[in-house]
Amino acid sequence: GCAMREITKIMKGWEFTGPDGTTTTVDLPHTWNARDGQDGGNDYWRGTCIYRTHFAAPQFNTASHQVWIQFDGVNASAHVVLNGSPVCNHDGGYSTFRANITELLRDENELTVEVDNSKNDRVYPQKADFTFYGGIYRDVSLMVVSKNHFTLDYFGGPGIRITPTVQGTDASVQVTTWHDGEGEVSIELLDAAGNTVATGKGPDITLTIFNAHLWNGVKDPYLYSCKARLVVNGTVEDETTTRFGVRSFKVDPKKGFFLNGKSYPLHGVSRHQDRKGLGNAITREMHDEDMALIKEIGANTIRLAHYQHDQYFYDLCDEVGMVVWAEIPYISEHMPNGRENTISQMKELIIQNYNHPCIVCWGVSNEITISTKDKKDMLDNHRQLNDLCHEMDKTRLTTLACYAMCGPFNRSAHITDMVSWNLYLGWYVPGFILNDLWMGFFHLCFPNRPFGYSEYGAEGMPNLHSTYPHRGDHTEEYQAKYHEYMLRCFKRHPWMWATHVWNMFDFAADARDQGGEPGM
């Protein structure tokens, strides 16, 4: 939030030229695959569609201010044009991007966004068990900001990086800012009640919070905030407020996850961002409802799969104390031409989300060994991503989700700080006991390697029931039996770093036909 910046959303009345070439009027958020991406048959339309809207230039002083446009999520590639001139291109359907449009503005403006979700070999994801809905499915906004402002065009980030470190009962908080134009930076840290707890000046300073109140997971997710102001000749030209949490965590391969020095076993769920009938074009109320349900089942961790989610949802995770695994959609099939895209999506993920206390690890890939031809290039890509994460973020761990069939000795499972497996033992293959054998065997071979379950589950249909449930019957009873076993199994293996059910909610995979339900 910022009083200095004037923000207007551009959500209503866009002209949309769709797959069949006809033009209709739509409001954002919008996807053209809400229906055909959920009805099965693996035939949802992938290609380029055009969104167009007209807007009057906002009031601003051309000598002292600029106008920026921000897109929170356009899947998958966007080509933005204003009044006939190209503004920017963006590859990656899940992250924020911005552009300075001051020079191109007229009194009346025509904004065109060409959105493309067609198959290619450069932009992830291309092969995966979920639908890649095309569209402008998150907010679009205009921002009037002073020429002197915290940086807006560095990988969609906030221009501020906050790194709290617990030191006994206190916390040292390093605040680094970047800005365009001139100005002196002044920093103010506030507690949850809005009282000032520390102040300082400079683009890279370390402040102390005495008797710091820790962000302590679901029990006590306490948040501080940091106000950064850019001051020119005594006038505040730009201001930005960012929430942060003070916490420490570690993973012990023999004892599991620790939060603020105490054992804190992580058991939770994975989440996709789509809804039936709407696809990925969802509302804040739906995010709230998802979180309420996740809290209700007693989860304390969420794997936000398989891509960057809406900022609003990471904020919710901060507020309710969920421990989060955040990841990029480097998935199923390694594409040698896609390396640059994995790097840019990871930079965006980290830079846009660094300040969220909920996030403890960056996931580099998911089931990448399923259909990868060039193993050497794939491993190299993983090493590069792993190094990038450590270089950009000294405070968090790296992880990945491995495909069951790749086995415990696969080299891709030994690059990141931790590893988790997608194992459906007792669902895709018979035998609950296989879970105990898998965990035990891995732990025996690699006692110093943190091990978790990134996916496990059994599909249950609310309309299918049985007194004698068996594997593959899609009954709720079999699903319940499976989860009861798994919870007892995790108790027997308390050293696991985290477990995530696949999935908290139904999601669309147009190629699937599970339990007689095409498309999910």
PLM regions: where:
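Short, Lys/Arg-enriched N-terminal segments with co-localized hydrophobic residues
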Residues: 1-3
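Short strand-turn-strand beta-turns centered on an Asx-Gly dipeptide
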Residues: 81-87, 190-192, 233, 260
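Substrate-binding/catalytic cleft of secreted carbohydrate-active enzymes
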Residues: 291-294, 301-520
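N-terminal carbohydrate-binding accessory modules
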Residues: 153-154, 158-162, 227-296, 315, ...
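Extended acidic/polar, glycine-enriched regions
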Residues: 103-108, 176-253
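Accessory beta-strand-rich segments of carbohydrate-active enzymes
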Residues: 6-19, 42, 46-153, 180-182, ...
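Surface beta-strand/loop "capping" patches
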Residues: 147-181
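Aromatic- and glycine-enriched glycan-recognition loops and surfaces
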Residues: 43-50, 61-65, 219-222, 251, ...
